[in-house]
Each structure stands twice: as C-alpha cells, then as structure tokens.
Amino acid sequence: MTGLPDAPEVPPVAVEIFGTRTGSAARYVELLATDGVERGLIGPRETDRLWDRHVLNCAVLADVVPVQADVVDVGSGAGLPGIPLALARPDLRVVLLEPMERRCRFLHEVVATIGLEDQISVVRGRAPDAGIGPDGRRFGIAVARAVAPLERLGAILFPMLRPGGVMLAMRGSRILEELQDARSGLGTQGWHPVDVVRCGEGRVEEPARVLRAVRSSQRTRAESRGGRGDGERHDGRQVRRTSRDSLRSREVGRDQPTRGQSRST
C-alpha cells in the first residue's frame, strides 16, 4: 500500500451521525482510502472527499429509513450506501448485493474488520433474482447509488420489495430532470407516491438527493396519472430523532415528518 494517500481526518459531524461507532466509520474510510483505491473501487482523487462526498453523504440516508427496516443495497460496490447506513443505524439489517466477486471479497473483509457481521450480509448476485430469498422474502427498503437510469432501476427493484416497500435512489444534481423524464414509466410500473427528498441539509457539506418511491400492490397504468411529483423535500432532522418519528409516519415504509413541502405522483 506504499504510495497510497492517507485517510482524511474525522470531521466533527461524524460523531453526531455515528455516535459510538465513529471509530468503525473512520476505519471504513481508512479501508476505502487504501485497499479500496488499490483494488480500483475508489478513485485516488476521491480520497480527500471520502467523508463528505461518500460516507457522510450516504449515512444521512438514514433520515428517511424507518425503524428496524430490512434493507438491500443493490449494486453495493465499495459498500456505498449500505455500510454507512448500517453504521449510522444499528437497528437496521442490511444486505449488500453485488455481482462482482472481487468487490464481494472487499465487502466481506470490511464487514469483518469493522465488526458488523451480525448486522450486514454480503450476497453475490444480480438484482432482482439474487435479492429475493428462497422463501420468497422481499425487503422493506431498497437503496441504490448511481446504479441505472431511474425507470430501469424502478423495474429492477420493484420485484425485490414487498407492497408498501420503498425505493431510495441516490442521484446527482439533475435529479428533478431525471424524475421528469422517468415519471410516467415509474407510475406505469406501480410506484406511487414518488417524490424527491434532501437528507442531511444543514448538517453535512453535501446533502443527499434521494428519489423516494413507494411500491404499490400491483402494476397499473392508473398509477402514472397522479400529480407531478417534481418537488424537493428537505430532511434535516438528526438521525437519532428519525427512529422515533418514523413510527408515527402515516405511510407504510415512509420516513419521519420532514421540513418543507413536496408534490408527489
């Protein structure tokens, strides 16, 4: 590992988000900056931004995940967003689904090193088939980070979620344009309501932009005839408050009440 950059220092906000697991989060960042770069999972130019752009950006996704949810991270790669999400929320059970063997080896090593083997499982395979258990078990939450265009991603994740389950797709600055293009197709697939939320605003340097969509009980074209669904909602609550608030959410699988308003489809 000679010549590889050092892991960046732990920012103060990491303690707020990870609490007693901050040390484990720091160890994960160190592994990303060393083994992750050496194995081609993280670009060397990203090491200075590992906390803000990657780990914290993914961890604040916890703001919109309900208590004790079973989560699948589709196309996990280097463990983003699944590992930061699990570190921030010990109540969750997380499956990292990844088709590439070399990435799975890295994920197994990371999970063992940071001591999350009781909380995180690594599964090698492709969605959606590999993400459904032999007993037909489906998940309550599916998360993905830059895996596929939204409409295609919706088709992949739909069979992996039980009715009322939630897709959380992390996207970039063009998220509203992407939603505009994919809205009709997502509705036809059976996603309703659909909205955009911003997680971690006011706490982290780079808030997460997330498309949130609820899986209906069946696929119907009528699902695509609702409202516009192109507003952004702002989720700035602290992670610790999320667990209590999400129990009072009126929708199955939705997050705690958030600041701001959005329109949904």
From Swiss-Prot:
Annotated EC: 2.1.1.-
CDD domains named among the record's database cross-references: AdoMet_MTases (cd02440)
Subcellular localization: Cytoplasm
UniProt key word S-adenosyl-L-methionine: yes
Keywords, ordered alphabetically: Cytoplasm, Methyltransferase, rRNA processing, S-adenosyl-L-methionine, Transferase
Positions of S-adenosyl-L-methionine binding: 75, 80, 145
Region (Disordered): 212-265
GO MF entries: rRNA (guanine-N7-)-methyltransferase activity
Family statement drawn from the similarity comment of this UniProt entry: Belongs to the methyltransferase superfamily. RNA methyltransferase RsmG family.
Physiological role: Specifically methylates the N7 position of guanine in position 518 of 16S rRNA.
Stated name of the protein: Ribosomal RNA small subunit methyltransferase G
Source organism: Frankia casuarinae (strain DSM 45818 / CECT 9043 / HFP020203 / CcI3)
Gene: rsmG
